[in-house]
């Protein structure tokens, strides 16, 4: 592959800088040269991405040299996090920019640098030599999607490469389209909506769907059975996760100190809130499915977020009746505690004190202090609902758990605590 002039290298970096991919200070730092060695033949990224068995590269195991512009960078152990991506993404110079129906090969490639490898700055054009592989390896993976990557053994800077451009995307790519766009820059267009935030505080992901409404559970709309299965399949085709640029579990170790990617006080990411993309993302498979990956790690660096989130919590609807019914998830309110169960351990807080029972018969608070804290918050919240009837979820049934004989023991205790706060006789429970 022959790149152009040095002036084009600077132009390419400036283009990436304008897209928000490259800090302005990097845009002019493109003067190093990495000339190809005599006899060296560069393999186009699209050839490396040619599909062989399954969705794996046909060149798995081969040692190749290729040229590409760095579009995303994920240094090892950034911000002290352990499970970082440890590499960078490159894309064929001058590629992208338009959606091409019928595309069969990607022009993007993930370069694995390991924990101590060099991570070039985004916007840099590089010549990389390494071994082609899949992550996870075909023999080890238990999922249908893997990431084609190049395990780098040498890297040099090339001058004169035209910057790649993000491809506009108004919907979630189909599986075949995603394979042909793997590791390439996309620029999602229009409004997207948060349809799931269950793993946001653990793995930093938000599940999005194009349009202005979240996806609904199948049996909210259709009858159980084949119709529901078909509906869920259609939902799956319209959903994609926005990742945070790391594989770190944010609920463990020092990662608990890292700022969340898409959550902040006063700026929630509720289901139904709208998302607009302000920066390109990389489309890549992680943990068995394709995701939108930011071009830099957002965990610990929320200012790098590629999206803005807007929304307003809907108010209570106006109805004709005067009886107010509410539902409340008490999140494993167990009056039987982990500390009282032989052999039970717990999940620790930042001080190391066990807060929640871990893999025990009981599933709630571990200590009396933790239970008192949980109970106080539940009591305050329920009494503030102004409800006449409250249906509870995740409250202990000691008989089912195998630690007691009174099915309603925890329910009775909670009602007692509610009445102590609201006044005797305010609440009663249905046995």
Model regions and ranges:
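Flexible glycine/proline-enriched surface loops and loop-helix/loop-strand junctions
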Residues: 171, 362-363, 374, 399
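Conserved SGNH/GDSL esterase-like catalytic core that processes O-acyl groups on lipids
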Residues: 354-372
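Intrinsically disordered, low-complexity serine/threonine-rich segments
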Residues: 10, 34-36, 403
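Extended non-catalytic accessory segments flanking core domains
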Residues: 28-30, 34-356, 374-380, 418
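Active-site micro-motifs of SAM-dependent methyltransferase domains
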Residues: 18, 332, 397
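Active-site surface patch of divalent metal-dependent phosphodiester/phosphate bond hydrolases
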Residues: 368-431
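Short, structurally constrained coil/turn elements
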Residues: 21, 319, 422-423
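Secretory targeting and sorting signals
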Residues: 1-29
């Amino acid at each position: 592959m022959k790149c152009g002039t040095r002036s084009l290298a600077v132009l390419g970096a400036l283009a990436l800088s304008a897209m928000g991919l490259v800090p302005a200070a990097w845009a002019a730092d493109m003067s190093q040269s990495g000339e190809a060695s005599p006899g060296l033949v560069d393999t186009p990224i699209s050839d490396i991405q040619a599909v062989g068995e399954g969705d794996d590269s046909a060149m798995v195991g081969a040692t190749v040299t290729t040229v590409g512009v760095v579009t995303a960078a994920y240094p090892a152990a950034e911000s002290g996090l352990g499970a970082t991506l440890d590499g960078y993404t490159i894309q064929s110079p001058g590629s992208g920019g338009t959606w091409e129906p019928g595309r069969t090969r990607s022009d993007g490639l993930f370069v694995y640098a390991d924990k101590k490898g060099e991570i070039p700055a985004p916007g840099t054009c590089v010549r990389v030599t390494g071994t082609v592989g899949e992550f996870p390896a075909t023999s080890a993976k238990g999922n249908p999607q893997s990431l084609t990557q190049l395990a780098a053994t040498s890297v040099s800077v090339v001058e004169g490469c035209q910057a790649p451009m993000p491809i506009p995307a108004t919907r979630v790519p189909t599986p075949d389209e995603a394979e042909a766009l793997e590791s390439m820059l996309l620029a999602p267009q229009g409004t997207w909506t948060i349809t799931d935030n269950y793993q946001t505080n653990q793995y930093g992901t938000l599940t999005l769907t194009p349009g202005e409404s979240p996806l609904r559970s199948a049996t909210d709309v259709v009858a159980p059975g084949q119709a529901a299965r078909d509906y869920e399949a259609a939902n799956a085709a319209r959903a994609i996760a926005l990742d945070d640029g790391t594989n770190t579990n944010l609920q463990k170790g020092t990662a608990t100190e890292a700022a969340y990617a898409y959550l902040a006080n006063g700026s929630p990411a509720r289901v139904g809130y709208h998302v607009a993309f302000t920066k390109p993302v990389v489309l890549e498979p992680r943990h068995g499915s394709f995701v939108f990956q930011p071009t830099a790690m957002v965990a610990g660096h929320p200012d790098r977020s590629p999206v803005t989130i807007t929304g307003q919590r809907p108010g209570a609807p106006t109805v004709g009746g005067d009886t107010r019914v509410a539902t409340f998830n008490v999140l494993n309110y167990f009056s039987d505690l982990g500390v009282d169960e032989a052999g039970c351990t717990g999940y620790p807080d930042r001080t190391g004190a066990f807060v929640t029972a871990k893999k025990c018969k009981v599933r709630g608070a571990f200590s009396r202090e933790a239970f008192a804290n949980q109970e106080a918050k539940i009591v305050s919240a329920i009494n503030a609902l102004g409800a006449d009837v409250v249906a509870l979820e995740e409250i202990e049934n000691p008989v089912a758990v195998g630690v007691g004989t009174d099915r309603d023991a925890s329910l009775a205790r909670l009602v007692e605590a509610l009445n102590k706060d609201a006044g005797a006789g305010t609440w009663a429970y249905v046995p």
